[in-house]
Swiss-Prot record:
Name of this protein: Aspartate--tRNA(Asp/Asn) ligase
Species assigned in the record: Helicobacter acinonychis (strain Sheeba)
Cited SUPFAM superfamilies: Class II aaRS and biotin synthetases, GAD domain-like, Nucleic acid-binding proteins
Site (Important for tRNA non-discrimination): H30, G80
Cellular component annotations (GO), alphabetically ordered: cytoplasm
Gene3D superfamilies: Bira Bifunctional Protein, Domain 2 (3.30.930.10), GAD-like domain (3.30.1360.30), Nucleic acid-binding proteins (2.40.50.140)
GO biological process: aspartyl-tRNA aminoacylation
Amino acid sequence: MRSHFCTEVSEKDIDKIVKVAGWCNTYRDHGGVVFIDLRDKSGLVQLVCDPSSKAYEKALEVRSEFVLVAKGKARLRGPGLENPKLKTGKIEIVLEELVIENKSATPPIEIGNKNVNEDLRLKYRYLDLRSLNAYEIFKLRSEVALIARNTLAQKGFLEIETPILSKTTPEGARDYLVPSRVHEGEFFALPQSPQLFKQLLMVGGMDRYFQIARCFRDEDLRADRQPEFTQIDAEMSFCDENDVMGVVEDLLREIFKAIGHTIPTPFKRMPYKEAMENYGSDKPDLRFELPLVEVGDCFMDSSNSIFSNIAKDSKNKRIKALNVKGADATFSRSVLKELEEFVHQFGAQGLAYLQIKEYEIKGPLVKFLSEKGLKNILERTNAQVGDIVFFGAGDKKIVLDYMGRLRLKVAEMLDLIDKNAWNFLWVVNFPMFEKTENGYHAAHHPFTMPKNIECEDIEEIEAYAYDVVLNGVELGGGSIRIHKEEMQKKVFERINIHEDEAQKKFGFLLEALKFGAPPHGGFAIGFDRLIMLMTQSNSIRDVIAFPKTQKASCLLTNAPSPISEEQLRELHIRLRKLSLKDMI
């Protein structure tokens, strides 16, 4: 049907007959001469038709998004008529034949216009996908998937599919449940990850497994979350942390070659505690400096009892300083107020600061600090004339969080972030357990190998867990797994999953660990998130062909939707409205 894609027509085709196909991107009638910009997956080429052509009458019928097949002679555009913005900007095709394969209603969205309301774009996603930018995104997505497959296959990994209909197990988020028609009152769960099955593959001697896996989590959505998502998932036997990290680094190095970027390996490694204390995040963005500095001891003799009491509880409290170089010249009083309001939404009671002037130091904290304390703060933060030093004080977890967010906010305001940089980092030595309102739970998942399970202070137990971070975004992570039944039971006990419950939920895993499970570990990389970063897209929805909204609905198909009474009966389900009493 065609001899060339639109942008394949070049100067070497001058005076030759070519045949192209695609959609009418724009239509113009200039004094009887018709110009059509034809668009296909490769880009645009200009068609031109004057009244002498036998295709002229047909060309007059063309409108936006009509599907066309065009045949004509390629020629150079006239002097001054070239379009340097187009790959085909020096040439045009003089129409000899034109077939309208299909007409189009007036499109409800302008193809390629990112300023169109996102809900409207998602409702007409098939039109939104016609944009050249969308094609480039999904072309890269396809290339990256192929690179991942080839790279892992060359390293001896087997691509093996794991079940989609599985057993509900607690992994941190709610499961999507599927009622069984055959087993009345029982449910399958869609997998949040292939975690347990890939471990069982290692028990089964598969040695190295991978898949590009579909996963499902019924959780509150954010810009980088979807209820169904894809991850590059892998597991390997007889390995340690270094082996797994090496595979991930090799994989990402090959993937980033696809966009012409050579990333240095090995990646820098940073312990979790260092990341939290110095950057206020377990996924620090290291494209810029601005570290947090601990200054609690500088307030030990403060005349302000609030600060001095915080300083004396170094286990549970923190006083952190953030020196913003040169900020005194650019941060007005209104900006300082804006920053205070910003951190307030994350639990800060206020935002104290010192302004380093040429002949004095100003700020509400000055009068509460001893001369020695002030001197130590200035030295430790390397504060100089023109700087502003911000302070966060209070509960350790809250202070680290809002000061880390302040660090990012200030970096964005001062344009300190190199948008063209790719900064990879391993965060290691995560805590094994985290405290919640209902006790402790596994920070990653309960199948991660702990480093010091016998430690009396549960919060000091670390895990053989590791996250790979790119530009302040968690790209993926993994861990060395527990491969002995006794250790798995100890971990369950630490998070109050007692023997009966453990057997009910994970009996199949505990049984498998009795039969010579090898040491093993693995990783998962968020595939959608990776493509979002590589294409510098604003939302993960831009890199998924048919994404859900932030309310977990599909505007294109109107899913989820009610089902018929007959379907409910087949599934042995009856719906009823809950009363207030039922919900209490």
